[in-house]
């Protein structure tokens, strides 16, 4: 089988700068096969449609304040490696302790105040994660200054066919937003993105689309190329396609 991973390094001349659109080997599952298989595993088309995620429009993403982006980045950072429901239960206290994630106010927070907040029993006391609040507030502020537009406008303008580029941006410029943390935050915010869940990664590997480290640029480009291809076939969002694939492989979980 010809793998997308191999194509990602051997067919650069076929790539459009934005979308990494490689030739699609015919042996790979097409959208109709995936959709029918997911319907079968979830108990029918109606049941499947009810489980597909929704994304926000570009207009909605533009209107979303920088405080909401920072809040969701922070929530996902604290949920990483922890019990999600505990973070969710304490979230109103997080909002209070961090001034509803007011970026400008957080940027003025001195180190000693940051240390005190990290010891506040109202939230989860993890100093290294608490420091990301100010670090990511700085990332948002610097992005807005460089781009001369709001962070919401910046996020909304990023093309879905290069969403892994946005993952890489958050990984490079943000704090603790690498791995699945950044992508999961984007999904929750309503940005159209696929996810490297265990089932999705297993599917991509089993079909030779991805090999090696999943966070390598080669793997990300190969995965993006396959999802772009499915998107062109179906007209579905990356988020919907990711969920459909997750139902076609492994433990058939909603992720």
PLM feature segments, named:
Residues 3, 9-16:
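Low-acidity, Ser/Thr- and Arg-rich intrinsically disordered low-complexity segments
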Residues 67-71, 92, 127-134, 164, ...:
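Non-catalytic, well-ordered alpha-helical scaffold segments
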Residues 8-9, 22:
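Short linear/disordered segments characteristic of secreted peptide precursors
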Residues 19-126, 130, 244-255:
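N-terminal polyanion-binding entry modules of DNA glycosylases/AP lyases
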Residues 19-54, 148, 152-255:
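C-terminal accessory module of base-excision DNA glycosylases/AP lyases that mediates lesion recognition
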Residues 99-176:
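Alpha-helical ds-nucleic-acid-binding substructure associated with the helix-hairpin-helix region
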């Amino acid at each position: 089988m010809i793998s997308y991973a191999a194509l990602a390094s051997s067919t650069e001349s076929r790539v459009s700068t934005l979308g990494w659109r490689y030739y699609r080997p015919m042996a790979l599952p097409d959208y109709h096969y995936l959709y029918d298989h997911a319907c079968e595993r979830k108990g029918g088309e109606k049941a499947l449609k009810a489980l597909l995620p929704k994304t926000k429009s570009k207009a909605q993403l533009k209107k979303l304040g920088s405080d909401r982006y920072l809040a969701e980045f922070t929530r996902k950072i604290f949920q990483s490696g922890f019990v999600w429901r505990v973070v969710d239960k304490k979230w109103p206290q997080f909002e209070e302790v961090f001034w509803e994630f007011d970026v400008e106010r957080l940027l003025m927070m001195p180190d000693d105040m940051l240390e005190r907040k990290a010891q506040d029993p109202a939230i989860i006391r993890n100093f290294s994660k608490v420091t990301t609040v100010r670090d990511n507030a700085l990332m948002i502020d610097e992005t807005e200054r460089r781009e001369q537009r709001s962070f919401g406008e910046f996020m909304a303008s990023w093309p879905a066919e290069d969403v892994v580029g946005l993952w890489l941006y958050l990984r490079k410029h943000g704090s603790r937003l690498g791995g699945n943390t950044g992508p999961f935050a984007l999904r929750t915010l309503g940005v159209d993105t696929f996810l490297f869940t265990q089932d999705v990664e297993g599917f991509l590997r089993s079909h030779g689309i991805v090999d090696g480290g999943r966070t390598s640029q080669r793997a990300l480009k190969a995965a993006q190329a396959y999802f772009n291809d499915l998107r062109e076939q179906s007209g579905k969002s990356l988020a919907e396609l990711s969920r459909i694939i997750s139902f076609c492989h492994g433990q058939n979980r909603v992720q």
